[in-house]
C-alpha cells in the first residue's frame, strides 16, 4: 500500500464544509432521480454543482485510491450470496432466502442489516437455512461510514459486499430472488473474463453518463445502458480495488447521491474510475408489475426483482403496510404459490 498522503487543502475545505449545516441542505432526502431534484441552498445555487465541490470530490477520490490496501492472499474463500435487508425488508429477505433454497442453490448466505433491524428471534428464523447474520452498524462502529438518515440503506450494499467473508459474491437486494439456481453465474464466460457482472435498469436506453457527474467522480463520460443493482456478481479478489472504490463513493453519499440515483450507479462508476472492464447482461430487462424481470445471457428470466408490492406481514414488529398475505399474488410470476406458502409459514412462527 502506498504511503498515506495528507488530504489537499481543497479537500480539507470540502470535508470541513460537511460539518457545516448551512452548507448542504438535507431536507430533500427523497427517492427521485438526480435530474428531478431541485434542492438549493440559501443562495439558490445547487451546491453539488459548484466547481470547487466537484473538484474537491475528484481529488478526494484520487487521494483515496492511493490508500486502498492490498488484498491479503487467502483471506477470503469460496463463493456465497450476500443479501441486505432487515427491518421492514426482513420479510422480503426471508422469502428470497426460501426461494434460493427451493431452487436447489446450496451456496452459503450472509444477511447484512443495520442497528435495530433484527432481533434474536429473526436471526433464529433464518439461521437454519444456512444464513449468517451481520450487524453492519456494529461492524462499522468507530467509523463515519453510515449517514444518520435512510440513505444508509443504500450505503449498506457496498459495505456488505466488501466486508462479507466470501471471495466471490452474488449480491442481492432483499426483494430480488432467482427463479432457478443462479450458481452457474460464477462459471459464465463473461464473469470468468472480467470478474464482475452487472444488469441493466428497466426501460432504459443507452445514454451518456452526465458530464458534470463524471468529472466530479473522476471518470470519463461514457455511454451505456444504466445499471440496476438489485443483483450483481463480483469476484472480490480480482476486483478488490473496485469494491473499495464503490464503498468510497457510497461513503460520500452526502455528495454522490445528489448526482447519481443511490448506490446503483456507484458500482459501474467505480469500475470506470479504475479503468476496469465488467461483463453486462445486455438483454434489456422487462418491467412486469410489480417489478423487474432480469434475464440471463440467453434472454431467459433469472431474477424477479419485486421493486413494488413487496412481501410484508401486518401486525409484526417491522410491518409498514396494511397489505395482507395473499393479496399481492402475481399470476404471471414464477414461484408465487411457494412464496405465499413461505409467507404463511413465517406468519406462524414470527410474532
Question: What is the meaning of each model-derived region?
Answer:
Residues 1-79, 83, 89, 221-351:
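A glycosyltransferase accessory/donor-loop signature
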Residues 118-164:
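Active-site-proximal specificity loops/subdomain of glycosyltransferases
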Residues 144-145, 188-245:
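Conserved catalytic core of nucleotide-sugar-dependent glycosyltransferases
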Residues 135, 153-209, 232-233:
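GT-A fold catalytic core of metal-dependent nucleotide-sugar glycosyltransferases
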Residues 83, 87-104:
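Histidine-anchored nucleotide/phosphate-binding helix
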Residues 90-91, 117-122, 206-207:
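Short, charged/polar "capping" segments at the starts of alpha-helices
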Residues 108-116, 198:
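Short internal beta-strands
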Residues 79-83, 100, 109-111:
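Hydrophobic targeting segments
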Amino acid at each position: 500500500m502506498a504511503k498515506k498522503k495528507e488530504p489537499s487543502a481543497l479537500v480539507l475545505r470540502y470535508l470541513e464544509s460537511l460539518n457545516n449545516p448551512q452548507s448542504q441542505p438535507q431536507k430533500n432526502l427523497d427517492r427521485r432521480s438526480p435530474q428531478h431534484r431541485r434542492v438549493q441552498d440559501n443562495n439558490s445555487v445547487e451546491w453539488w454543482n459548484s466547481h470547487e465541490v466537484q473538484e474537491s470530490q475528484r481529488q478526494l477520490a484520487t487521494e483515496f485510491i492511493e490508500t486502498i490496501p492490498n488484498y491479503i492472499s487467502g483471506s477470503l474463500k469460496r463463493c456465497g450470496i450476500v443479501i441486505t435487508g432487515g427491518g421492514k425488508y426482513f420479510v422480503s429477505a426471508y422469502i428470497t432466502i426460501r426461494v434460493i433454497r427451493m431452487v436447489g442453490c446450496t451456496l452459503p448466505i450472509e444477511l447484512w442489516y443495520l442497528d435495530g433491524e433484527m432481533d434474536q428471534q429473526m436471526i433464529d428464523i433464518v439461521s437454519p437455512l444456512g444464513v449468517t447474520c451481520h450487524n453492519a452498524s456494529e461492524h462499522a462502529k468507530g467509523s463515519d461510514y453510515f449517514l444518520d438518515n435512510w440513505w444508509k440503506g443504500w450505503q449498506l450494499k457496498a459495505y456488505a459486499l466488501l466486508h462479507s467473508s466470501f471471495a466471490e459474491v452474488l449480491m442481492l437486494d432483499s426483494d430480488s430472488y432467482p427463479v432457478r439456481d443462479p450458481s452457474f453465474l460464477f462459471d459464465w464466460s463473461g464473469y470468468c473474463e472480467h470478474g464482475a457482472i452487472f444488469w441493466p435498469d428497466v426501460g432504459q436506453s443507452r445514454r451518456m453518463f452526465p458530464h458534470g457527474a463524471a468529472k466530479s467522480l473522476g471518470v470519463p463520460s461514457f455511454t451505456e445502458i444504466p445499471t440496476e443493482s438489485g443483483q450483481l456478481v463480483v469476484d472480490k479478489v480480482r476486483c478488490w480495488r473496485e469494491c473499495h472504490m464503490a464503498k468510497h463513493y457510497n461513503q460520500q453519499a452526502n455528495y454522490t447521491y445528489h448526482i447519481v440515483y443511490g448506490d446503483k450507479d456507484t458500482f459501474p462508476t467505480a469500475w470506470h474510475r479504475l479503468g476496469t472492464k465488467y461483463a453486462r447482461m445486455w438483454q434489456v430487462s422487462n418491467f412486469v408489475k410489480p417489478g423487474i424481470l432480469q434475464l440471463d445471457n440467453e434472454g431467459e428470466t433469472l431474477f424477479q426483482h419485486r421493486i413494488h408490492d413487496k412481501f410484508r406481514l401486518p401486525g409484526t414488529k417491522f410491518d409498514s403496510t396494511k397489505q395482507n398475505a395473499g393479496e399481492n399474488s402475481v399470476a404471471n410470476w414464477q414461484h408465487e404459490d411457494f412464496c405465499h406458502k413461505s409467507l404463511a409459514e413465517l406468519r406462524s412462527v414470527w410474532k
